[in-house]
Structure formats: structure tokens, C-alpha cells
């Protein structure tokens, strides 16, 4: 028999942890499907400078979030959610070979980046960044490169040129390779190689998860309303999987809103 919860949260980044804390504060029985701490992009961030009241490394921040999650009373399910199925008045969630039931589901999936450049994953948090406004000040007065052609990328180039000594902008697709020692030192673009201190990669990345049939999405991510409700009643979404901006404060706030909305949904059903 499937184990049943009031609310099941898929994802244990800041949006998922925020949602779990808020659901537990409302007295709900909660489970969180969590990947390893080390696999989270937050864990690899060099420094967190854009979250109010905190200034610490991504690893320290991620570990504090994990500690809060471990102590909040939610059940932690290690693994990867494979599907979310409607069971009428509830949802079934497959995680590996196990099956769980919940009255409501919160998707806090983050984003999945595909077609990584050589060196991109290796140097993430050590000179590779996906957010110029988050990490740009770490490279004040230094030489950086930005890969991207979107309107957001153009704005980021303008921002970086105000604080960096030199900004190399690569708007056209080509073969890129990032290399260095402990940190980024070089970017190879085509046949040319450039000495840089950081590489900002601005992609239109979205979650590629297709967990639930009928879940409406656009090019930015899962479509939600102001209550973080998706197109499927009882399924809510929060954080990077709902689209830009990819910011910690946004993810935390959306996690809280999704949790309160899910709790209200459960209460109205009388689950």
C-alpha cells in the first residue's frame, strides 16, 4: 500500500525547503523527494551575495537549508521522481520503484541544463556562472566573457561592462571550451583562445521534466498563477522551474506561496 501524505514536494533546493517549512508550520504531513546535496547548483555557487541578511558560500547556504529540512519533521525520500499520476482525489508519485500518495503536489524541480560546454560543469561556481546579476560583483575589475544572444544576455553585458575591466560577448553559437586550474582561466571560442577570469552562460534553460500529463508550460517553464497553481488542480510549482529570474529570493518566496496555497487546497478538500 502506498504511503500517504498531505503534501508531497519534489525538489529540495531553496524553493522546496521553503515550501516544506511552511507546510510543516501549518501542521501538514509532508514528504520531500530530494537529490543529493552535492548535485544542487546552489551547493557549487562561489558566494551568495544577493540574498537579504546572508553572505556566505553556496555550500554553506545549501548545508544550512539541508539542516533545516532535516529538522522540520518532513519525511525525506531519496531518489528521483519519475511520474505524477492523478488518482481522482489525490496524486500518486513514483520515485524509483516506490510509490507514494499525496493530496497535493508541489513541483520545485529547478532547471535542467542540456548541451553543456566542455568545462562548464567542472568550473561551475569556480568562474562559470549562469547569473550575471548574482555573481558579477565577484569579478569587479576583471576580464570576463559572456555567452548568449537573448535580450537578457544583452542587458547582462551592459551590466558587466559597468563593473568589469573587459567583457567579451559571444552572441553566436560556436564551439566553446572552458579550462583552467582551480578556477576558470581560459575560454576557447572556435579556434581562438582568450584569457578570462569568468564565463557567464546565459541560456534559455527550462525544466525538461514531463512528470505530469496535462501540465501546461511555455519556453520559460511551468505556467502558474499568482497562487503558484499550475494547470492541474492540486499541483503547484515554485522556483526556477516556473521561469526567470533565477534568483534565490524569488524561489524562496514562491516556495512559501505554493505551500500556503497547497495547504488551503487540502483544507478545502477536507483531506
Please report, for each region that a protein language model flagged, where it lies by residue.
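FAD-site-proximal beta/loop scaffold in flavoenzymes
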Residues: 25, 122-138, 202-249, 254-260, ...
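Glycine-rich nucleotide phosphate-binding loop and flanking beta-alpha elements
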Residues: 16, 83, 112-113, 152-153, ...
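Short, well-ordered coil/turn residues at beta-beta hairpins
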Residues: 11, 108-110, 147, 200-203, ...
Amino acid at each position: 500500500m502506498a504511503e500517504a501524505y498531505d503534501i508531497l514536494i519534489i525538489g529540495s533546493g531553496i524553493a522546496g525547503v521553503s515550501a516544506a517549512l511552511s507546510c510543516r508550520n501549518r501542521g501538514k504531513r509532508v514528504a520531500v523527494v530530494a537529490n543529493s546535496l552535492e548535485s544542487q547548483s546552489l551547493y557549487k555557487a562561489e558566494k551568495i551575495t544577493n540574498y537579504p541578511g546572508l553572505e556566505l558560500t553556496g555550500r554553506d547556504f545549501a548545508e544550512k537549508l539541508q539542516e533545516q529540512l532535516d529538522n522540520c519533521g518532513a519525511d525525506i525520500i531519496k531518489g528521483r521522481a519519475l511520474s505524477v499520476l492523478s488518482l481522482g482525489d489525490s496524486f500518486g508519485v513514483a520515485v524509483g520503484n516506490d510509490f507514494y500518495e499525496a493530496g497535493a503536489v508541489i513541483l520545485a524541480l529547478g532547471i535542467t541544463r542540456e548541451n553543456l560546454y566542455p568545462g562548464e560543469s567542472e568550473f561551475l561556481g569556480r568562474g562559470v556562472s549562469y547569473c550575471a546579476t548574482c555573481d558579477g560583483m565577484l569579478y569587479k575589475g576583471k576580464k570576463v566573457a559572456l555567452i548568449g544572444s537573448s535580450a537578457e544576455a544583452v542587458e547582462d553585458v551592459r551590466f558587466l561592462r559597468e563593473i568589469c575591466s573587459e567583457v567579451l560577448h559571444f552572441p553566436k553559437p560556436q564551439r566553446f571550451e572552458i579550462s583552467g586550474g582551480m578556477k576558470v582561466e581560459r575560454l576557447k571560442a572556435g579556434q581562438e583562445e582568450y584569457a578570462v577570469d569568468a564565463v557567464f552562460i546565459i541560456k534559455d534553460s527550462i525544466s525538461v521534466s514531463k512528470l505530469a500529463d496535462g501540465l501546461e508550460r511555455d519556453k520559460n517553464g511551468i505556467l502558474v498563477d499568482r497562487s503558484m497553481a499550475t494547470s492541474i488542480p492540486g499541483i503547484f510549482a515554485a522556483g526556477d522551474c516556473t521561469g526567470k529570474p533565477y534568483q534565490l529570493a524569488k524561489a524562496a518566496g514562491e516556495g512559501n506561496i505554493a505551500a500556503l496555497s497547497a495547504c488551503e487546497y487540502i483544507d478545502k478538500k477536507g483531506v
